Amino acid sequence: MPLPDFRLIRLLPLAALVLTACSVTTPKGPGKSPDSPQWRQHQQDVRNLNQYQTHGAFAYISDQQKVYARFFWQQTGQDRYRLLLTNPLGSTELELNAQPGNVQLVDNKGQRYTADDAEEMIGKLTGMPIPLNSLRQWILGLPGDATDYKLDDQYRLSEITYSQNGKNWKVVYGGYDTKTHPAMPANMELTDGGQRIKLKMDNWIVK
């Protein structure tokens, strides 16, 4: 099936990515050791989550395109998740449903696509090389396969450096939502050369 000329409506102002919630804490002071028991406990608490969902603002910025959207991310089980991107008017631009061995994506024209790899599909259909497979861990504040990372003074991720498939991603966490337990990321930015991905999570629901 030919790939569509798929581009999200780019109307969401970048200012919407500014954090305003008083419950967000930002890293202060020197970071902690990745070998600390507090960090191991935090990772275990996050991994123990069976279901979670979050929504907020998304921005992808490169020399070729600038995309702004609202997003909704829901995980309902191991390797089962749903990603929804909407424009500022609330219309769906992209809906992705993934489960083991099957990924389905519906674009803003109602066209349905199937594949085995969500990251590859999103890249081909949107032109945005989003590291979705790693982002599923990073958005939770977990390093995933990355071994080069730093912690903040509260034993949470503050920075990740990760190289794969010719990409050199740097992830910086700007704050955490302390209304949830465990505390979850509230603001993060991914960069690779001239590409930037910004995520601002409005809230989390975890189980």
Swiss-Prot record:
CDD domains: LolB. A lipid is attached at C22 (N-palmitoyl cysteine). The gene is lolB. The keyword Nucleus does not apply. Its main location: membrane. Plays a critical role in the incorporation of lipoproteins in the outer membrane after they are released by the LolA protein. The keyword Ubl conjugation does not apply. One of its GO terms (biological process) is lipoprotein localization to outer membrane. A lipid is attached at C22 (S-diacylglycerol cysteine). This is Outer-membrane lipoprotein LolB.
